[in-house]
Regions:
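Charge-rich, low-complexity N-terminal segments
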Residues: 1-78
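Residue-level detector of solvent-exposed, low-hydrophobicity positions
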Residues: 10, 17, 71, 103-106, ...
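Acidic-enriched, low-complexity/disordered segments with a strong bias for Aspartate over Glutamate
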Residues: 11-12, 29, 45, 89-91, ...
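Short acidic, glycine-rich loop/turn motifs
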Residues: 30, 101-106, 127-132
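Short, structured motif recognition centered on aromatic/hydrophobic residues
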Residues: 35-40, 111-125, 152-153
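The feature represents the first ordered module of a protein
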Residues: 48-115
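Short, well-structured alpha-helical patches and their helix-loop capping segments
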Residues: 108, 117, 140-144
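Mixed-charge, glycine-accented linear interaction segment located at domain edges/termini
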Residues: 122-161
Length: 161
């Protein structure tokens, strides 16, 4: 997925999370001609999702208008996370759209938000925390129920199909 310069600088400034104990998963999706991969940890409280990446290996012709429509539809569909998603960045030439939680979760020490990056053939889902005192952005787990995880995987698959 080709990122805009602004998005690339932003992604480079997000530190990787501490995901020891998370299980890595990798699934081939023959119908979609792609792969689903990421890492998560299951517990009695549900699922902690580190990151999920759905990539289509067979390139699909897609205009930016269609990509934007898919992003808008995804932001409406994914209404079961704690914060609603809105488009915050896009790059027409690079065929890239970024959705983020608005308003994000805030407390005295941090700001947290969900982020879904949508490219022509790839979708990345993660949660990011900005720690105010250290002024550091770091990836953190996204807390979901099993049902929310299955629905999220279904919704992102529909967006890239």
């Amino acid at each position: 997925m080709k990122l805009s310069r602004k998005a690339k600088r932003y992604d480079d400034s997000v530190l990787p999370g501490e995901f020891q104990g998370f299980e890595v998963f990798h699934r081939v999706d023959a119908e979609l001609e792609g792969t689903l991969e990421g890492f998560l940890r299951r517990s009695q409280d549900g699922v902690q999702l580190g990151e999920v990446v759905l990539e289509r290996h067979a390139p699909k012709k897609l205009s930016f208008a269609k990509l934007k429509n898919k992003a808008e539809a995804l932001s409406e569909q994914v209404n079961y996370l704690k914060e609603r998603l809105e488009i915050v960045d896009h790059d027409r030439r690079g065929m890239y759209i970024q959705l983020r939680s608005l308003p994000p979760y805030k407390d005295d020490t941090q700001i947290q938000f969900n982020e879904i990056s949508i490219g022509k053939n790839k979708i990345v889902v993660k949660r990011i925390a900005f720690y105010r005192k250290e002024e550091v952005k770091q990836q953190v787990p996204l807390q979901l129920s099993e049902r929310e995880l299955e629905r999220l995987l279904f919704d992102i698959r529909q967006a890239i199909a």
